[in-house]
Amino acid sequence: MSDPQMSMAATAAVSPSDYLQPAAATTQDSQPSPLALLAATCSKIGPPAVEAAVTPPAPPQPTPRKLVPIKPAPLPLSPCKNSFSILSSKGNILQIQGSQLSTSYPGGQFVFAIQNPTLINKGSRSNASIQYQVPQIQGNSSQTIQVQPSLTNQIQVIPGTNQAITTPSTSGHKPVPIKPAPVQKSSTTTTPVQSGANVVKLTGGGSNMTLTLPLNNLVNTSDIGGPAQLLTESPPTPLSKTNKKARKKSLPVSQPSVAVAEQVETVLIETTADNIIQAGNNLLIVQSPGGGQPAVVQQVQVVPPKAEQQQVVQIPQQALRVVQAASATLPTVPQKPSQNFQIQTTEPTPTQVYIRTPSGEVQTVLVQDSPPATAATTSTVTCNSPALRAPHLSGTSKKHSAAILRKERPLPKIAPAGSIISLNAAQLAAAAQAMQTININGVQVQGVPVTITNTGGQQQLTVQNVSGNNLTISGLSPTQIQLQMEQALAGEAQPGEKRRRMACTCPNCKDGEKRSGEQGKKKHVCHIPDCGKTFRKTSLLRAHVRLHTGERPFVCNWFFCGKRFTRSDELQRHARTHTGDKRFECAQCQKRFMRSDHLTKHYKTHLGTKGL
């Protein structure tokens, strides 16, 4: 007797004109209908099958419920003729208007509002089963949504049969209000979901759920063969400690839920109780912001990658836009190929270069040559000369600078008139040479065969190996270079003679060694042609020669300064501008000045005042 009753109840649920509503017996009906007599007879024999499936074992009720046929209630007029009613197993009627349907989403999905959310779960009935049969607007098949509350919080969606089984936990009995999405003007058509035993299951508690989706159900047929892409959005607010714990607990639970032997992708979705997830070709999420505002439907299409990797899709709670299936995927960011820079150190030929700073410290720079095959892949590093000649370097800094300079190729030096001289390390000889100090533009390096050229490639200076003790090369013109080289070679002692250091190599000093008288009146003369100036001290002669060559060996070591000077006293006077030292004081007015000539000029003002 229970089978005819269930079939009749299903027939009444589908028909919009005739349906049943449970109510108590009234005295207005004089004669009971045949359906009422049949229900009364079944109640005498035993409890109905519908109530036996819904209610748990409980004490028998004294009075049975009677089903009385009533007239259908008038339905309100709607702009479209797509409204229908839903009859639950408990007799509650849910009316869905055509204006609440939205079928503009890809895949034929539509969202409707349930006006009676209290039917989802009851605290007293943990095993209650509510089944809704919703016919499609266009199509032969129907979608069945079955909600089964139990102790575990699981949502199982079966796209093959268009069934969604929801089993919320008994701890939270909050209804889920769903407001209709804004109606979009489009044709009301639905497309069936792909058939097959593709199971989509959500497990976990709290506000975090783990979605396990088969890859063959998530791949769009139009994007087969394209690159794997994934849409990732970060939530605006951080998760609480309870949510993090719930997420950690929900991950291992979802692993045994997959029983099919196929490639499965795990997607972690951070959602709340107000979100409804519907699986198919696309991932549909309905978000209700609250405050009387309409709900927003967000549709995300997940395309799995080629390799077996776990991808994460995070959807923010305040998302107020609808992501269409065509624009859901984002282009992948092209990655630059890795560049390998290799410096081959086999068979090294290091060359030591000694650099003496104006303060007297000696720095050792090791320049290591690499084979020509690796020279093309090794980047060239340019080093500035003031950094190489920075004074007051500790032992550790010397080692660090030497290690860095091993990778450098050109060592440019500041030449006179502002030009740059490139000292190529490839031209340095690897064999051990005689230790010799050569002063090239104020930088003293080891005497090895090098060729110094300017930026234009013109050869300006060639230094040869000589056995002299100290050799000073300060000229850049060919005549000056040849003159100084001849002087150095002429001053070199013979193998059998005793060598001594020469303080000055000017013509007067060379000729004065052979003369015996008037040594006190000897003057140092400039050897530059058409000059002929004489000086009392060799230091003054050297400073004068720097004016001809343009050499400025004295460099200011203050940050962001780097000014160069010909004489050391000029550098000391310039350093007072940085320190603010005013060592010259007027004896009459106690004013202080940085330079002595400024004090002399100021002192003349006092003499002029006294004369008046």
Curated annotation (Swiss-Prot):
Biological processes annotated in GO: circulatory system development; embryonic organ development; fibroblast proliferation; in utero embryonic development; multicellular organism growth
Domain of life of the native organism: Eukaryota
Phosphoserine: residues bearing it: S78
Keyword annotations: Activator, DNA-binding, Metal-binding, Nucleus, Phosphoprotein, Repeat, Transcription, Transcription regulation, Zinc, Zinc-finger
InterPro entries: Znf_C2H2_sf, Znf_C2H2_type
Chief localisation class: nucleus
Comp. bias (Polar residues): 184-195
SS bonds (residue pairs): none
Keyword field contains Ligase: no
One Gene Ontology cellular component annotation held by this UniProt entry: nucleus
Molecular function in Gene Ontology: DNA binding; zinc ion binding
Cellular location(s): Nucleus
Location of the region described as Disordered in the Swiss-Prot/TrEMBL record: 166-195, 226-250
Zinc finger annotations (C2H2-type) as residue ranges: 524-548, 554-578, 584-606
Residue ranges of the motif 9aaTAD: 360-368
Function: Binds to GC box promoters elements and selectively activates mRNA synthesis from genes that contain functional recognition sites.
Family: Belongs to the Sp1 C2H2-type zinc-finger protein family.
Record-linked PANTHER family: KRUEPPEL-LIKE TRANSCRIPTION FACTOR, TRANSCRIPTION FACTOR SP2
Free-text note regarding domains: The 9aaTAD motif is a transactivation domain present in a large number of yeast and animal transcription factors. In SP2, the motif is inactive.
Protein name per the record: Transcription factor Sp2
Species in which this protein is naturally found: Mus musculus
Lineage of origin: Eukaryota, Metazoa, Chordata, Craniata, Vertebrata
Gene: Sp2
